């Protein structure tokens, strides 16, 4: 993964937005010793991830206080860009993310076609995490999800990974009109 084009783009953008030394120097008496043991960006990212996850727990531990407002915004933009590089139609991921969703979409449509052909009524449920749902929306060109940009600084304007919930409901409703024609809503 670290040799892939998308990861290089992600790393370059991360380096342009985040200085791990600022955080590490605030947190540790001897930041150099810590950096000798841990990759600086990875360690700071783990603290940021803990702060993100902590807000979902029933304990009120204010981990966001470890970061400046600028660092919180920077990490939000960087991780949003990472998600974009992994899941969008950006050329750097060679279609891996949305290619997986193409399989999911094909499965949904094939199962639906079979039910329609056999005259069945019912529901087919397919489960996918937020990444799968995002890629599905990319394939469908829903809202801005299918768009690409030419600069990492523009991603934030069209792509916000926090708008994809961990649990989603995407529905394809097929029905026949009075003439028996199948219509997709």
Q: Each predicted region: which residue ranges?
A:
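Signature for phosphate-centric chemistry
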Residues: 1-124, 128-185
């Amino acid at each position: 993964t670290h040799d892939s084009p998308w990861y290089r783009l992600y790393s370059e953008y991360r380096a342009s937005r985040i200085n791990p030394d600022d955080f590490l120097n605030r947190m540790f008496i001897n930041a150099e010793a810590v950096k000798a043991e841990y990759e600086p960006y990875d360690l700071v990212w783990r603290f940021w991830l803990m702060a993100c996850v902590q807000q979902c727990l029933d304990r009120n531990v204010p981990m966001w206080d470890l970061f400046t407002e600028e660092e919180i915004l920077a990490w939000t933009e960087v991780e949003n860009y990472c998600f974009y590089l992994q899941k969008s139609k950006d050329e750097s991921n060679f279609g891996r993310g949305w290619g997986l969703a193409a399989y999911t979409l094909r499965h949904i449509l094939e199962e639906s076609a079979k039910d329609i052909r056999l005259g069945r009524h019912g529901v087919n449920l397919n489960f996918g995490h937020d990444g799968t749902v995002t890629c599905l929306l990319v394939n469908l060109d829903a809202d801005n999800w299918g768009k690409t940009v030419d600069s990492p600084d523009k991603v934030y304007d069209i792509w916000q990974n926090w708008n994809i919930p961990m649990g989603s409901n995407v529905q394809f409703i097929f029905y026949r009109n009075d003439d028996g024609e199948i219509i997709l809503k």
